[in-house]
Amino acid sequence: MASAERVPVSFNKPGRVPFGEVQGYAPGHIPAYSNKHDHFFSGERSIDDNVFCGFKYQCVEFARRWLLERKGLVLPDVNWACHIFKLKNVKDAATAEEVPVIAVRNGTEAKPEPDTLIIYPSSDVNTVGHVGAITEVGDDYVCIADQNYRFHKWEASYSYKLKLQHKDGVWTIIDDIDPNDVEIPLGWVTFPGYENRPEGAAPPALHPSLHFQPPEEPYLVRKTYEPTETKANWLDLNDPAEKLFVEEFGMDVSRSRLEETTVNYYECDHEFHLRCIAYGTQLHDYFMEATAQVINDDERLRIFKIPEELWPRMRHSWKYQQTYISGRFDFAYNNETHQMKCFEYNADSASTLLECGRIQQKWAESVGLDKEGTRGSGWAVERNLRTAWATCGATGRVHFLVDDEKEEQYTALYCLQAAEAVGLEGKLCVMYDEFRFNEEGYVVDSDGVRVRNIWKTWMWESAISDYFAAQAERGADWKATPADKVRLCDLMLGKDWDILYFEPMWKLIPSNKAILPIIYHNHPDHPAILRAEYELTDELRAVGYARKPIVGRVGRNVTITDGTGEVHAESGGNFGERDMIYQELFSLTKQDGYYAIIGGWMLGDAFSGTGIREDKSIITGLDSPFAAIRIKINAIPRPLTHKDLDKLAEDE
């Protein structure tokens, strides 16, 4: 039963400009594009007239384009936006000669100037700082044009105004738009001697030495490391999620239940990490696009073998719940061809999320890998998991519904902690014996709290099977009473259609491999997409193929056949009677006898991190060990705050 006054929930908040659309134009007709929200990172490079401007659509990307188009100058590479304040020079776009710049501290006798770059410091909530352009200066305000700070449509040639205070001869810019997060920018950077380029002028002729140089090909390498010292008891047994992990697997990131003397992990470069982000972000959009095509097309939807009786409910979930928490891509990479391909999207899964977001980093610290010039690949997971919960539309209590397996329970507890961190109330529910029906026939928990939000590890397919079994047992005229026992289907497919589910029912579509041929035919030229068909074609026979059930988990009932017709691997399981799809065979690189599958996490609508499942078999399964990924970095950037600038001034 659906409520007539139900309001749809969505990540697309009213007034927020979608990613990539123009928010407005700064003076000089320089566009600013929406980055969607603060924690979204596309991983896509922005190239303007052969200049690398940054990543779409971060604040530095706008600053570089603004400086090039407004002044004919090129901003050198910086790690973070705040580091622009420490620059001594930029370059002339035409000559590549160095051009001195002047950084002016905020809170001095100098009044801000228009056509300069305003720089924000590092903070607890934003380590990288921020940069924008000052477009206008009044006696008590400055106007700012920027990206990735506020996401509305501009009403003029700037995004917002900031307060400018003049007191005791000192000029101070104050960002108090959010009274709960007042910020004082570091200052602004000026470009003496460089006038603004004429409105509508052709792009400056760029010196060849400033042209963008493509990066080296990415790599992913399995490594063996012998720690010089190790930290015992590196997981917190007072943390419920970590305690359950230890009970199940011990102190071992690989979950192999073995003590480690030498350790194995995977190292990738920054380019590999960026490719995971870019492909994951793009593919998520493609799967959402294909879901929209399927859900209201009866002919296509029949291919997915979802019972037609449940279509109205699934369509209701698509219409009214456009929020979600987690999904994981399965990527494969070949170090010789430097190709990365997507095998599938586990859009209704949270398995190995704790391992990716917390365990692999704590393990790396316990064996000293955090001191080896690398960074964890799951650093954004916990932040983005909290953001997903904060924006998902749930209020009050969330029931975390799991089986009696410890792996499901620690995964649930990890997600529960993130929900509670943003003000929700979480309750772990192992099985469903504690639930009952109230007098109105709605499900309540042991505290009498009506179920309004459910996070679950149960497959929707399990609930559907139970739904039809219950129909057969209860009969057509059955109505729930407090004396009746609550079943799985009563929680997931009961009378209340307005319960928020994580993941929602419509994720039956993107998590079904029947979507893969649609994805391929929609975007056949995308470098990460493999050919996929509903029937075995001559093209697939020629290159080899994987035969997969449209509904299945953990690598069950998969057959891999090469281009000669020889079967290289096959797995058993309980999905063999399902319809099949045929996917182009992709050659994985075998390292130290192992094949690696990269799990790429979407949390909410943002790509958030990676982890690896490896196996000596080319088909990874439920028991395949987890392996950590470390991202090689040249140096760890340091924050820049007002105190840092004060100390630098003292040292000088």
UniProtKB/Swiss-Prot annotation:
Kindly list the positions annotated as binding ATP.
328-330, 513, 548, 555, 583, 618-620
Q: Which domain of life is it from?
A: Eukaryota
How is it modified post-translationally?
Answer: The N-terminus is blocked.
Q: Which keywords fit this entry according to its UniProt record?
A: ATP-binding, Ligase, Magnesium, Metal-binding, Nucleotide-binding
Tell me the residue numbers annotated for binding Mg(2+) 1.
Answer: 330, 344
Q: Which reaction does it catalyse?
A: spermidine + glutathione + ATP = glutathionylspermidine + ADP + phosphate + H(+); glutathionylspermidine + glutathione + ATP = trypanothione + ADP + phosphate + H(+)
Q: What class of enzyme is it?
A: ligase
Question: What positions are marked as the site Transition state stabilizer?
Answer: 328
Pfam families referenced in this protein's UniProt entry, alphabetically: CHAP, GSP_synth
Q: Which Gene3D superfamilies match?
A: 3.30.1490.330, endopeptidase domain like (from Nostoc punctiforme) (3.90.1720.10)
Q: Show the GO MF annotations.
A: ATP binding; glutathionylspermidine synthase activity; metal ion binding; trypanothione synthase activity
Provide the transmembrane region boundaries.
none
User: Taking every annotated instance into account, which residue ranges of this chain make up the domain Peptidase C51?
Assistant: 34-174
Cofactor(s) recorded for this entry are:
Mg(2+)
Q: What is its EC number?
A: 6.3.1.9
Q: Cite the InterPro entries for this sequence.
A: CHAP_dom, Gsp_Synthetase/Amidase, GSPS_pre-ATP-grasp-like_dom, Papain-like_cys_pep_sf, PreATP-grasp_dom_sf
Binding locations of Mg(2+) 2: 344, 346
Family named by the database record: In the C-terminal section; belongs to the glutathionylspermidine synthase preATP-grasp family.
Q: What does this protein do?
A: Conjugates glutathione (gamma-Glu-Cys-Gly) and glutathionylspermidine to form trypanothione (N(1),N(8)-bis(glutathionyl)spermidine), which is involved in maintaining intracellular thiol redox and in defense against oxidants.
Q: What is this protein called?
A: Trypanothione synthetase
**Annotated organism of origin:** Crithidia fasciculata
- What taxonomic lineage is listed for the species of origin? Eukaryota, Discoba, Euglenozoa, Kinetoplastea, Metakinetoplastina
The gene it comes from is: TRS
